Amino acid sequence: VLHEREIVTLIGPNGAGKSTLIKVLLGIVHPNIGEIKTTKPLKFSYVPQKFNPSHSLPLRVKDLLALEKCDPVIKQEIIHDTGISKLENSKVQQLSGGERQRVLLARALLRQPDILVLDEPMQGLDIQSEAELYDYVRSLPAKYGCAVLTVSHDLQWVMQGTHRVVCLNKHICCSG
């Protein structure tokens, strides 16, 4: 169960089913058993663990953001809040890991999701970028009214940034 404005983190060893569960939630694959039940239709946004666009497809940050239609005022607020204002004319392929994560997070937020799914959002970030992203992600449920579902191996995030943890190992081992 995932509640509105809640941050839940999935943890577990490699092969535990974290990515599969995300794919089921996003509708990419169908579950072998069981089903996903919701009280209303939900809008998801997903930030992948890795995003490496081809160098043969020159894509600027503003072009990537333009793929998602959004109120211009909300768009500018998200661009400001994620700290990517100065990156809008940059090519996505040339961004650092932290910059790319912030751009992907901004794009996901432009959808105004009910549930924001972040797959290892801190991976590859320097300590400063990680701390800034932690703080920002913690603010998202209150600011945008969305639930946040993360996959993480970062125990600091699990202990400090999460309302609830779900431990997987081919099934839900525990939750709390």
Each model region followed by its residue ranges:
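H-loop (His-switch) and adjacent beta-strand-loop-beta switch element
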Residues: V165-G176
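Conserved ABC ATPase signature
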Residues: K91-L95, E99
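Helix-to-loop junction immediately C-terminal to a conserved catalytic motif
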Residues: L26
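Hydrophobic anchor residue at the start of the ABC signature
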Residues: L105
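Catalytic Walker B motif of ABC-type/P-loop ATPase nucleotide-binding domains
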Residues: L116-E120
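Conserved ABC ATPase "signature" region
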Residues: P72-E88
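H-loop/switch region of ABC-family ATPase nucleotide-binding domains
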Residues: S152-H153
